[in-house]
A protein has these predicted regions:
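Non-catalytic interface/linker regions that flank or bridge core catalytic/transmembrane domains
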Residues: 13-17, 22-285, 289-290, 295-298, ...
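Eukaryotic serine/proline-rich intrinsically disordered regulatory segments
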Residues: 289-311, 488, 492
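All-alpha helical catalytic cores of prenyl diphosphate-utilizing isoprenoid enzymes
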Residues: 235-238, 258-267, 297-301, 337, ...
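Divalent metal-dependent phosphate-bond-processing catalytic cores, especially two-metal-ion Mg2+/Mn2+ enzymes
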Residues: 143-208, 215, 219-223, 278-281, ...
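Structural signal for hydrophobic/aromatic residues that build the beta-strand cores
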Residues: 6, 19, 28, 32, ...
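Short hydrophobic beta-strand segments
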Residues: 1-7
Length: 561
């Protein structure tokens, strides 16, 4: 069954799970953007019924688009929602077959992950139903390889069309009105949330997180504009453009992933944001809390944006200029777009098409950077990609974003730690561009695994959702290894759901009594060495080491009992 969104006054009774009559095409776009405040995957196809000819009397430029243009717009901006777009003359039998096949594939969370990655066929009517780009079902449930190919091979003309559509959307859709709670009090509270190292990501809705991103990127752009007002080739996004950009980035993440979702992206961005403030690359702001161990408590002061402070933090010499700082923050925001909720090891072991394409090297990170650059930024902010990172260099923001995202591959972790040690002791002499790339890479790496450096309650929340995602991967492995007997592993007719992450440490420990095992392993193997070395190079980040040590001692003590 499917959700039906009809703009032609017609429903499809034999397919209808939920029916919404939509008054106009702009209203349809608003509805689809708002859907991603829900923190689940789309587990049913959405059938959109559009009139083949646009209404002659409408004043909306979006409404006046042709059927083919509307189809292109919808499939570009909302393909994560599993859309089947039809006009009045749809073929009943073909539509019913497509919806039935899509419904079967989408029903279960583990099945969805297998289908996205291209590692399973056990629930598919034909082996190539998802992986053949000419297949109708491939467009309804876009796999990773489908998304990669469509966006990497898109023509210049199509890109220009999509930029035009984006401009129309920004002109006609007020993204601030799409936020679930845009009251001044709530927006002010979010300013203070951004200012805390104990960033309460799991107590914030997806819409709250969108506004948090808006706050941080706006602050960085304002600083860039102040430092470099003469760059006329760089397009400064309006407030509505920037918020729309964040909505679009959010829609590129898989909301149902327990860990690698939009919330994680915002958390990594917020960690990078704190790093660059403490390192002097951005000035501190009024809502910034210098004590990293203070627990967040909701408060507001009426300010709905971050207010720059006149006071600078002590002994700060900027390590990145304003353009490089913005590049790092944007890379953090997009560093996991399209993440399927698996690991590189999984993708390689089970011959995922993307692993074959990227020769088993940084598979997911290569995918994230390609999709973020070619699908999102090339349409939403092309002038940012072309911007030089410095007046004396050929290194562009695009180059920095790619190198930063690739650095988040944990398979390359030891190599970066060794480079850090060499750089720290002056054994490795780098030119200016490579120094900027290394500093950016190290900061995003630290931010990516900063969960263990957050105060214990927040850190344990992240540990809990990560354990959920690892458990899903193990279930998927079992399904692949026993495809002939999938029903004995999991009921594919039922979806997998989770309770909301508790905000109380003791409740988390009750639900996950062995949480300390993974935390001790990760801190010992990866985090402690990286953060101790980065703090020697950048002593302003010493606080991360102090919190890691406190958390580690807690987990070690718990492991004794």
């Amino acid at each position: 069954m499917a959700e039906i969104l009809s703009l032609i006054g017609t429903s499809i009774p034999y397919l209808t799970n939920t029916l919404h009559q939509i008054a106009s095409f702009p209203d349809l776009i608003r509805y689809l953007f708002k859907k991603s405040n829900k923190e689940t995957d789309s587990n049913t196809p959405i059938v959109i019924l559009l009139p083949h000819k646009p209404p002659a009397t409408s004043t909306s430029q979006l409404e006046k688009l042709s059927f083919s243009d509307k189809t292109l717009l919808l499939t570009y901006f909302f393909n994560h929602l599993n859309l089947l777009i039809l006009d009045e003359n749809f073929d009943k039998a073909k539509t019913e077959a497509t919806v039935a096949e899509a419904s079967r594939l989408l029903k279960n969370r583990i099945s969805r992950v297998g289908n996205w990655t291209g590692t399973t066929h056990f629930n598919c009517g034909t082996d190539d139903c998802l992986y053949d780009t000419q297949s109708k079902i491939a467009g309804v449930i876009p796999t990773m390889s489908y998304v990669l190919n469509v966006n990497a091979s898109r023509s210049v003309q199509t890109t220009e069309q999509l930029i035009h559509f984006k401009d129309l959307i920004v002109k006609e859709i007020d993204f601030f009105e799409l936020l679930e709670n845009s009251s001044p009090e709530r927006l002010s509270e979010l300013c203070f949330a951004v200012g805390h190292w104990s960033f309460p990501a799991h107590e914030l809705s997806n819409d709250d997180l969108v506004y948090c991103v808006y706050l941080m990127i706006t602050y960085a752009v304002q600083h860039l504009q102040h430092e470099d007002p003469e760059d006329k080739s760089f397009h400064l996004l309006t407030a509505n453009e920037l918020l729309g950009f964040v909505f679009i980035v959010r829609d590129t993440y898989r909301n149902g992933n327990p860990f690698h979702n939009f919330r994680h992206a915002v958390d990594v961005l917020q960690a990078c944001f704190h790093f660059v403030i403490r390192l002097g690359s951005l000035p501190p702001f009024k809502q910034f809390i210098t004590d990293p161990e203070v627990e967040f408590e909701a408060r507001s002061d009426g300010a709905t944006e971050l207010v720059a402070s006149k006071d600078r933090l002590d002994n700060n010499i900027a390590h990145l200029n304003p353009t490089q700082t913005l590049a790092l923050l944007i890379a953090a925001l997009g560093h996991d777009v399209g993440h399927p909720g698996t690991t590189n090891d999984f993708m390689i072991k089970y011959n995922a098409p993307t692993a074959l394409l990227f020769n088993d090297r940084s598979v997911l990170e290569s995918y994230h950077s390609s999709v973020f650059i070619n699908k999102v930024l090339a349409v939403c902010w092309p002038s940012l990609l072309a911007k030089k990172s410095d007046t004396k260099t050929e290194l562009t923001v695009r180059n920095l974003i790619i190198s930063s995202i690739l650095a988040t591959d944990m398979g390359e972790h030891n190599e970066y730690v060794n480079r850090l040690k060499s750089f720290k002791t002056n054994n490795e002499i780098l030119n200016h561009d490579n120094t900027v790339k290394l500093i950016s890479a190290l900061l995003i790496k630290c931010a990516d695994i900063s969960n263990v450096t957050r105060p214990l309650r927040v850190s344990s929340q992240w540990a809990m959702v990560l354990s959920r995602e690892f458990a899903e991967v193990e279930t998927l492995k079992s399904l692949i290894n026993h495809e002939d007997d999938a029903a004995s592993i999991i009921d594919l007719t039922q979806d997998l759901t989770y309770d909301h992450v508790p905000d109380n440490l003791q409740e988390i420990l009750t639900l996950q009594p062995k949480l300390q095992n993974g935390q001790i392993f990760f801190i010992n193997l990866f985090a402690e060495n990286l953060f101790n070395n980065i703090a020697e190079l950048l002593p302003q980040l010493q606080y991360t080491c102090d919190i890691i040590l406190h958390n580690k001692n807690f987990w070690l003590e718990r492991a004794k009992h």
